[in-house]
């Protein structure tokens, strides 16, 4: 991962699936670092790899706040992907882990927008809608918790 991640690119103009890869690699680097001495060579390599994943996640953040994996608005350096609650939550957890392991963090503005987006996607039932466009239909099956006791939600 340390050798190959610097070469990871978007698959095409539509898919921003690489966001998932940067997120999970950041998790892997953070988890592995927890068992290493901070002055070891491997820890420093992991930290550098993690730093590049955080940089990429900053670059891949949606201007709407959060992260998405599909963009229908054409190709741009900063994807115009519609953010999803589950990818945004996953990125924020990974960033938190990187903070604990390496002292790394997302850009403050990006973090604030992502957190604001995520909070806006929460329904009164405590679930999160799938994505921004689903905010208008919180009761649709895709937005409901499978075990929700009230099927009318």
Where are these regions (language model features)?
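An alpha-helical repeat/solenoid feature that recognizes helix-turn-helix modules
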Residues: 4-55, 59-112, 116, 120-153
């Amino acid at each position: 991962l340390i050798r190959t991640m610097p070469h990871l690119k978007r698959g095409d103009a539509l898919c921003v699936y690489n966001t998932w890869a940067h997120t999970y690699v950041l998790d892997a680097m953070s988890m592995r670092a927890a068992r290493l001495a901070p002055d070891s060579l491997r820890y420093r390599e992991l930290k550098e790899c993690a730093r590049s994943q955080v940089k990429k996640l900053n670059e891949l953040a949606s201007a709407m706040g959060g992260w998405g994996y599909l963009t229908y608005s054409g190709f741009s350096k900063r994807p115009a992907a519609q953010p999803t609650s589950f990818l945004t939550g996953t990125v924020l957890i990974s960033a938190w882990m990187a903070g604990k392991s390496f002292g790394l963090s997302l850009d403050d503005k990006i973090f604030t927008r992502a957190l604001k987006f995520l909070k806006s996607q929460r329904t009164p039932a405590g679930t999160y809608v799938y994505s921004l466009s689903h905010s208008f239909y919180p009761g649709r099956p895709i937005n409901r918790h499978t075990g929700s006791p009230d099927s009318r939600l």
